[in-house]
């Protein structure tokens, strides 16, 4: 029984923790579920985000309680209830495949739907065993310490979630973490057959929507609606496989030129510009002016339609160029809307949420003279 107990504890602690450090990632996965089941409009987005945070807190707490042998009735009952819900759900996911993966371990460990179902069968058996033998669980700490551990556990996981939500995840398991080379992440090993992707563009004219590709992109009389990346032929899939930057004005693919630029380039990432936080827009405009002054590139990346981009420009006075990119890719790049990423020759040097942007006290000289990888708003520049 103790083997089952510690197995459940380890899995729940790990699962809860990786969700807590990336609450927006969990939120996006919940949105995927609701969209797949046709339930996206049933609840407001703030409730979906709250559910993501509460779920991570419950999983982490259950794991800690099982490990220390405290709150035994609560922990064993909740563990069993979670597995009663998740096991048949993941069986359905394995059979119907409405989402690519369950997201049970976030981006830290991606399992196929069948692997997830097999894992949940084992955990369900363990949960039943622990529930039946709950009274035999040995407590490792005193009753007084149990109360303190319980309170600290809840406090820790909620503070962690809200900190990572307000800033960026303290651990980045995605292929776009600081220090990664985007170009290398897109490379196909010699001899491997690459997957074939195609960018699809939906544009509208005279009330009629039509789909285009880069080969037949229409003239400026058409209004852009959205873009998406479509898998045409499955092959070897590199860690980064859908990074494509297309100019809004010309329809030109700028991916290679931006990733090959030997200078610094700021990328303002806003997966849906109409939902982006505009509280720090003056600072964003200052960073753009700084980029122009020093000859650095600056592009805004979004998947929003052209009319929403124009509304953003009118509201914020934005003068920087806009480019189109796949919505899922933008969400993967940075967990902030908007967020800012600094790259050079395809290497990610730093990322900032809109709450931690570098300001005029830091961005005074050339980036060659400052420790850009440690820039933070209202902080002195730290040495590398």
Residue ranges and their predicted role:
Residues 84-137:
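Membrane-embedded alpha-helical segments of integral membrane proteins
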Residues 258-275:
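Short active-site neighborhood of thiol/selenol oxidoreductases, capturing the structured segment around
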Residues 1-21, 46-89, 130-131:
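Functionalized membrane-embedded alpha-helices
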Residues 338-351:
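A short, hydrophobic beta-strand/beta-hairpin element that forms part of a small beta-sheet core
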Residues 141-168:
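Internal/C-terminal transmembrane anchor helices
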Residues 373-380:
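Conserved small/polar residues in nucleotide/adenosyl-binding loops
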Residues 13, 298, 315-337:
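Short, internal strand/loop/helix patches
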Residues 160-253, 257:
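Membrane-interface segments at or immediately adjacent to transmembrane helices
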